[in-house]
């Protein structure tokens, strides 16, 4: 049972790292490259979020992450991205 918990924790940690990586990528993009209204920005964000959602779905299907935990992770990232977007557009 302990081995399963380690695997579950590792899966969740990796999903969190991927979510943080997306947030950092978007921060860099907003700071250096494009505006939030730019189609390139939207394309990168949509692609990254889609990929992370598929990772979460896969982890849930394997029983590595609880469905609610996966939803919470996605909601947390969406809220952080929304705050970042608001901060950038309200400057």
UniProtKB/Swiss-Prot annotation:
Cited SUPFAM superfamilies: EF2458-like
Annotated organism of origin: Staphylococcus saprophyticus subsp. saprophyticus (strain ATCC 15305 / DSM 20229 / NCIMB 8711 / NCTC 7292 / S-41)
NCBIfam families: PRK13666.1
HAMAP family for this protein: UPF0358
UniProt protein name: UPF0358 protein SSP1677
Family: Belongs to the UPF0358 family.
Organism ancestry: Bacteria, Bacillati, Bacillota, Bacilli, Bacillales
Stretches of the chain forming a coiled coil according to its record: none
InterPro entries, sorted: UPF0358, UPF0358_sf
Domain of life: Bacteria
């Amino acid at each position: 049972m302990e081995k399963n918990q380690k695997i579950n924790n590792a899966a969740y940690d990796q999903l969190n790292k991927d979510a943080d990586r997306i947030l950092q990528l978007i921060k860099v993009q907003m700071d250096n490259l494009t505006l939030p209204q730019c189609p390139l920005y939207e394309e990168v964000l949509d692609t990254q979020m889609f990929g992370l959602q598929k990772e979460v779905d896969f982890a849930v299907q394997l029983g590595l992450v609880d469905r609610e935990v996966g939803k919470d992770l996605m909601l947390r990232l969406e809220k952080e991205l929304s705050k970042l977007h608001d901060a950038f557009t309200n400057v």
